[in-house]
Every structure is written in C-alpha cells, then in structure tokens.
Swiss-Prot record:
Belongs to the CDC37 family. Keywords: Cell cycle, Cell division, Chaperone, Cytoplasm, Phosphoprotein. One of its GO terms (biological process) is cell division. This is Hsp90 co-chaperone Cdc37. It comes from Saccharomyces cerevisiae (strain ATCC 204508 / S288c).
Length: 506
C-alpha cells in the first residue's frame, strides 16, 4: 500500500539545513524567533477559538430564553420585571451560566442576563423620551436586540470556521496521540473484584475484542466499496445491512464491524436511493428501515472523515463504530444524541415521502401530456380540403338507401350528430374520445358510404377563369379533332369509289 506523505506538508518548521537567512542574522536565533512566533500565534488562535465558542454558546442560551418569553409570556407582562423573572425561573435552570477556561466564575447566570436586558431596554426607552411601560415598545426593542445578536452570532461562527481551518492546516503537539499500543498486565491474585459489565444492548466486550483481534491480524488491505461507473449499484453486503430491523442496533454494530468497506459515500447514497424505490412502491416500513440504516452509515462515515484519513484504516474505523454506538445509540444517561439521530431519520423519511409523491405526480402528468393515440381528419394537400357528404335520407335509390342504413346502424349516435353539422372540427372532437382501433373501423365505414370527400380549392377568381378557359380550349380542340377525323374518313371513301369506277371502265 502506498504511503501518504501529504500530512508532513502541515509541519511549520523545517530543520536547519534548508533555512535561508540574511548573512547578518544568526540562523539559530532566527529559528528560535520563528518558533516563538508560531507558538504565540497558535496560543492566540486557540484563545480566540475558546472565546468565540463560549460566545456562541452563551448567545444560544440567551436566545432560547428570549424566544420562549416572546412566544409564551403575555405581551402585557413584558414590562413587569418580576413576572419575567418568575417565568424564567419556572422554565429554565436559574443557576445555569456560562462555563469555561476564559469565563469569569462570578459571571451572571443566563436568567439574570435576560433580566438585565429587560431593565436596560426600559432605561434606553426612557432616555429616548419614549414610554418604557409600553409592552409593544419593549417587544420591538427586544426583537431589534435579538436581530443584532443573530448578526453577531453569524459573524462569530464564520470566524470560528476560519480558525478551525487554519488550525487543521498545521500539526502541533496537541495532534499527537497513540496509534497502536500493547501492554501486558499481571493477573490479579486477589483483592478487589474486576468491574462487571453492566447489561446493555451493546456488543459484549468479548465479541468486540474478537472482531478487533481479527482486524489487527488481517494482512489483506481493505478499501471502501465505490462503484464509480454505477453510483446506484448496491453491494450485496450493503443490501443485506439495509434489511436489518431498526431496533436491532447490536446486530447493526456487529455487521458494520465485520463489513467495514460498505461504509462509503457511494454505498450510503445508493442505499438511500433504495429507500426511494421502496417508497415509490408504497412500502413505508422498508423505506423507514433503509433510511435508518443509511443514516447509521452516514453518521459513522462523517465522524471517520473528521480524522482526515484518506483510506480505510480498519482499527480507526472500528473505533469510530464502537464509539458511535456507545456514545450515541446506547447512552441512556444522555439520550439527546440518539434523539437527534432519530429526528434526522424521520426528517429524511418525510422528505422522501414528499419527493416520491411529486415524482409520481410528474410521471402521471407526463403520461397525460403524451395522451392516447387518436385519429384526426385533415387534408394533407394545401390545394384541397375535406368536405362532409351526407347520404340522401329521402332518396328512393337503392344505393342511397343502403348508405342511409349503414349511417344509422354502424356509426355511433354521437358521431352521427357531429356529421350532421358538416363541421370537420366537431367530427375530430368526437374522434378524440374513440380508441384507435374503433376509430380505424369507423373510417372504413366513412369510406364505404363516401362521408368524407375531397374538393379542390381555387385561391382567387383569376385561377377560376384560367381553369375555365383551359376547359373550353380543351373542349374546342376535342371538337375540331373529331371533325377532322370525320372529313378524313369521308375523303377516303370517295377515292376508293373513283378507283373502283376506273377499274370497271378499264
């Protein structure tokens, strides 16, 4: 396996050999000053991070209290400070306050800070010459202050992100930790009993040790499954993991420890798309189950990615899996983590339900837009148009009587009404509701009794006159030709008669 040397790019100091300084500057002093500068910058960066984290956390607690007051406390009580204090103490821990290395131990509690805010806002209104006893003015002042806090919080988080990136870009002694380690312990002959493992849904210590020992002894390098050519493709193991029921966490943990390569972005996303497939078939139970299993993979992968290991490290990934299940899933003392996880699962389930309905509706609309194949009558030649011919209902002619009989018996009543209007649009409108096979048979009936005819279209009077002249000329030519033929025939007879007479005389 190739060794990744990129992590050494983060080291800020090099050895003496490649440090170039001015000839008048002592190299050792320069390196010492450089070290000192780096340590000072690192210390300042860490202090800034701690201060901003404390600030963001404090604003979060204060906003929570202010929002609860604005939502649940009657507006008329906003100017009554004792009522505000009573409400705060009833809904929040009155002793809760900000803590940390950079926080003054004597700092006021969160409830006291909110009370001070109300007092200060009332004083500010008095200074501006406004009525500080007006609940609506107090509410407006609180909302303005709340907006300022939000703005400051956004800036603080933005600055924090920059500091985190800067910190992660360099290696320091804080980042050094034990990778692989082993030790021997003498067996205890007597004395205190070893701690007994408390009953838990988690894997037993023995089972976990067996899995980790297998990983440690395995000499075959593992890689994350990634079907780059087919992002929707699921590995057999991943599909099997998706079939594990929601509440079988121990089984899920054991399965992941034994199938580490499936914890990849591609497999996690492919499993989530499988949930879409189940939902489109109306299977809510399997949809929720597959989403739940996909989220387990997603949370574990996200934690592992924070370690910035660009390949599959079996021991590290196994530690992450065990830590996740221990701290989030099986942690009964602090259930917030599991609640947050399940909330995320539920949100994705609702999202997939909503998206599936939209996709089904779009497919239905598209199908309706394409429509059913129908027959429409239209002339294909611009110089002609179709006309509707009705049979003669009063005629005694056998042919016409036959057409009338076919018209009344083989043509649907609705189509008969459309034909009687002699309007082609009305006929086409009826054709829209007739299946293609039936419409084709109806066209054959039309053809048999000459319902639809074709007539030529003359664009103007000049065309009509030209056609008329052409007809008359053709008629005249035909007449002259007949006369000529008659004359020729008559002359031939006389010649024969003369000839025959001469023969007789001779």
């Amino acid at each position: 396996m190739a060794i990744d040397y990129s992590k050494w790019d983060k080291i800020e100091l090099s050895d003496d050999s490649d440090v170039e300084v001015h000839p008048n500057v002592d190299k050792k002093s320069f390196i010492k000053w450089k070290q000192q500068s780096i340590h000072e910058q690192r210390f300042k960066r860490n202090q800034d991070i701690k201060n901003l984290e404390t600030q963001v956390d404090m604003y979060s607690h204060l906003n929570k209290r202010v929002d609860r007051i604005l939502s649940n406390l009657p507006e008329s009580s906003l100017t009554d400070l004792p009522a505000v204090t009573k409400f705060l103490n009833a809904n929040f821990d009155k002793m809760e306050k900000s803590k940390g290395e950079n926080v003054d131990p004597e700092i006021a509690t969160y409830n006291e800070m909110v009370e001070d805010l109300f007092e200060q806002l009332a004083k500010d209104l008095d200074k501006e010459g406004k009525d500080s006893k007006s609940p609506s003015l107090i509410r407006d002042a609180i909302l303005k202050h709340r907006a300022k806090i939000d703005s400051v919080t956004v800036e603080a988080k933005k600055k924090l992100d920059e500091l985190y990136k800067e910190k992660n870009a360099h290696i320091s002694s804080e980042d050094i930790h034990t990778g692989f380690d082993s030790s021997f312990m003498n067996k205890q002959k007597g004395g205190a009993k070893p701690l007994e493992a408390t009953p838990s849904e988690a894997l037993s210590s023995a089972a976990e040790s067996n899995i980790l020992n297998k990983l440690a002894k395995s000499s075959v390098p593992q890689t994350f499954i990634d079907f780059k050519d087919d992002p929707m493709k699921l590995a057999k193991e991943t599909e099997e993991f998706g079939k594990i029921s929601i509440n079988e966490y121990s089984k899920s943990q054991k399965f992941l420890l034994e199938h580490l390569p499936i914890i990849s972005e591609q497999q996690k996303d492919a499993l989530m798309m499988k949930a879409f497939e189940y939902q489109l078939h109306g299977d809510d139970k399997m949809t929720l189950q597959v989403i739940h299993q996909s989220e387990l993979m997603a949370y574990i992968k996200e934690i592992y990615d924070m370690k910035k290991i660009p390949y599959l490290n079996p021991m590290e990934l196994s530690n992450v899996i065990n830590m996740f299940f221990e701290k989030v899933i099986f942690n009964k003392d602090k259930p917030m983590g599991k609640e947050s996880f399940l909330r995320s699962v539920q949100e994705k389930f609702l999202h997939i339900q909503k998206r599936s309905k939209i996709l089904q509706q779009e497919e239905m609309d598209e199908s309706n837009a394409e429509g059913v194949e129908t027959i429409q009558l239209k002339s294909l030649d611009d110089s002609t148009e179709l006309e509707v011919n009705l049979p003669d209902f009063n005629s005694k002619d056998p042919e016409e009587m036959k057409k009338v009989k076919v018209f009344k018996t083989l043509i649907p009543e609705k189509m008969q009404e459309a034909i009687m209007t002699k309007n082609l649009d009305n006929i086409n409108k009826v054709f829209e509701d007739i299946p293609i096979e039936e419409a084709e048979k109806l066209l054959e009936v039309f053809n048999d009794i000459d319902i639809i005819g074709i007539k030529a279209i003359l664009e103007n009077e000049k065309d009509f006159q030209s056609l008329k002249d052409q007809y008359e000329q053709d008629h005249e030519d035909a007449t002259m030709e007949n006369l000529s033929l008659n004359d020729r025939d008559g002359g031939g007879d006389n010649h024969e008669e003369v000839k025959h007479t001469a023969d007789t005389v001779d």
